[in-house]
């Protein structure tokens, strides 16, 4: 693609990140994946966590050094903030900002709090982003298999003159130089990431699956067959698209399936849906969505909890759980073990 620069391991100085002490704040999905990959790449990593908490125990079980967040910030050259978006600003204000010193690096894996101004860093620190384009469990599993996931890097403030090089070095240390690293901006990453999640990857996809499932069940079809046709098989199709684009997917499926795709797809995802997508994007660009999310979480997340409970209670979850527990393919090589990661 013209104008697209992809950085690989041979473009990057890995020794740069190895010369710094890295404090990873948080041990959720990304904290788990990134900190262990950094450790295995020979980096000097410490974890800033609530001492005695569940994450602290899990991190110690992996042989990682943990301490309080203020102590980790004081010791580190790089502070990678990997706690949930909704609590980053408060933790930053109370535990990180008072312990910052000039020349340190504040790092993020999502530009949300910087882009929307919930965190306002001092002018004498570097602010960078390394955003793996996969959940943390996949960041870890791909690294362990000798591969990596692509990452985006961005620079918001560069006091040192080497912020981009350091971001690239960090990305390589978590395995992304094996696959490819792309430069972007905090604005572009934040807005496209939120839109992708809401319109396709999470919101659009889950709503499409559930609506199609309901349509078949309400028409009298077995919920088990409905699950297989509109949910289980989705991965098989997405794998084809992931590897070779929509064209390769069309090449692999039957003429009947392709004709149905080309003649019926746009009847479902039509101009009205595109108009709604533009509204979703406008809310992201204006900051309206960001403020709504932060206000909801600050007020206790009552509506969020109700929506989450309704989703968990959908018939497709019961049917899916029953089907998955009956097949061996679901028990092998699971990425997520909630007791460990």
Model-derived regions, located:
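Short, flexible, solvent-exposed loop/turn segments with mixed acidic/basic and small polar residues
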Residues: 37, 68-71, 139-146
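Rossmann-fold NAD(P) dinucleotide-binding segment
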Residues: 69-119
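NAD(P)+-binding Rossmann beta1-loop-alpha1 motif at the extreme N-terminus of oxidoreductases
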Residues: 2-66
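A short helix->loop->beta-strand "cap" motif at the edges of active sites that frequently abuts
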Residues: 43, 100-104, 123-125
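Active-site-proximal catalytic alpha-helix in oxidoreductases
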Residues: 161-165, 174-175, 180-219, 224-242
């Amino acid at each position: 693609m013209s104008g697209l620069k992809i950085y690989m391991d041979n473009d990057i100085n890995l020794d740069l990140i190895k010369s710094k002490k890295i404090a990873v704040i948080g041990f959720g999905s990304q904290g788990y994946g990134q900190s262990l990959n950094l450790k295995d790449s020979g980096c000097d990593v410490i974890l800033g966590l609530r001492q005695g908490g569940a994450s602290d125990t899990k991190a110690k079980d992996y042989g990682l050094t943990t301490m309080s967040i203020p102590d980790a910030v004081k010791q580190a050259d790089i502070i990678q903030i990997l706690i949930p978006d909704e609590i980053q600003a408060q933790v930053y204000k109370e535990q990180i900002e008072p312990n910052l010193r000039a020349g340190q690096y504040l790092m993020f894996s999502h530009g949300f709090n910087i882009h929307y101004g919930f965190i306002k860093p001092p002018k004498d620190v570097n602010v960078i982003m390394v955003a793996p384009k996969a959940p943390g469990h996949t960041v870890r599993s791909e690294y362990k298999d000798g591969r990596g996931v692509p990452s985006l890097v961005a620079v918001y403030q560069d006091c040192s003159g080497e912020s981009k090089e350091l971001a690239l070095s960090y990305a390589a240390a978590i395995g992304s130089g094996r696959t490819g690293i792309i430069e972007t901006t905090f604005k572009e990453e934040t807005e496209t990431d939120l839109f992708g999640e809401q319109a396709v990857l999470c919101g659009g996809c889950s709503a499409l699956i559930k609506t199609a499932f309901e349509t078949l069940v309400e028409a009298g079809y077995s919920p088990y067959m409905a699950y297989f046709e509109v949910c289980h098989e989705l991965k098989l199709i997405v794998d084809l698209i992931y590897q070779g684009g929509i064209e390769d997917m069309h090449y692999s499926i039957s003429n009947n399936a392709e004709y149905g795709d080309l003649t019926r797809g746009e009847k479902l995802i039509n101009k009205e849906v595109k108009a709604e997508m533009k509204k979703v994007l406008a809310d992201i660009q204006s900051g309206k969505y960001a403020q709504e999310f932060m206000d909801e979480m600050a007020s206790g997340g009552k509506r969020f909890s109700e929506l989450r409970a309704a989703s968990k209670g959908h018939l497709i979850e019961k049917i899916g759980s029953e089907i998955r527990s009956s097949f061996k393919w679901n028990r092998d090589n699971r990425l997520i073990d909630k007791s460990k990661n």
